[in-house]
Amino acid sequence: MKKLILILSVTFALSVSASDIDLETFGQRYFATMVATQDPNATEVDLDNHLLLLADDVGHSHLPWVIDDSRLPDGKEAMREGMLFYLGTHTEYSAELLDVFTFNTSAVAIRYKKSAKGIHPQSKQAIAYTQTIMEVLEMEEGKVAVIRKYHE
């Protein structure tokens, strides 16, 4: 399954332009690759498959923790480093895509519910949570340029 997601992600990332992108399909693909990064058995390959969908200078906010969504030249690399820190944190993870909203060719929003259990890599404390999240993905040239993440 992971190889299929990789092949689809690479094919999709290389074959679309801003004018012919199907944002609903893109939102579903983004969700699938994101979920793969949270799996207890996720690997760096899963991270890279997800990161293929992002612009190199991607900006990211995750309120209330990360409020600066500035686009920086190393945005994707910084995101990869953050994702590596949390890689393998979960012992259990599930997510359900609830909605996909499209906004002409400029943005797509996904709303999903996720549940996770695991051990926080820094505090070494057990974590368990269920959240409903909305991510607004601002698009540029067929890639995610800015991610804005909100909790319900």
Regions found by a protein language model. Give the residues of each.
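A solvent-exposed, acidic/Ser-Thr-rich amphipathic alpha-helical stretch
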Residues: 21-23, 48-103
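Short, surface-exposed coil-to-beta transition loops
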Residues: 93-96, 128-134
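Hydrophobic pocket/interface hotspot
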Residues: 30, 50, 58, 79, ...
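A short hydrophobic beta-strand element
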Residues: 104-116
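Short beta-strand edge/turn micro-motifs at domain boundaries
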Residues: 107, 130-152
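Short, cysteine-centered beta-strand-loop-beta hairpins and adjacent loop/turn segments enriched
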Residues: 85-92, 116-128
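Short, low-complexity N-terminal intrinsically disordered segments enriched in polar/charged residues
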Residues: 12, 16-53
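Sec-dependent N-terminal signal peptides
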Residues: 4-13
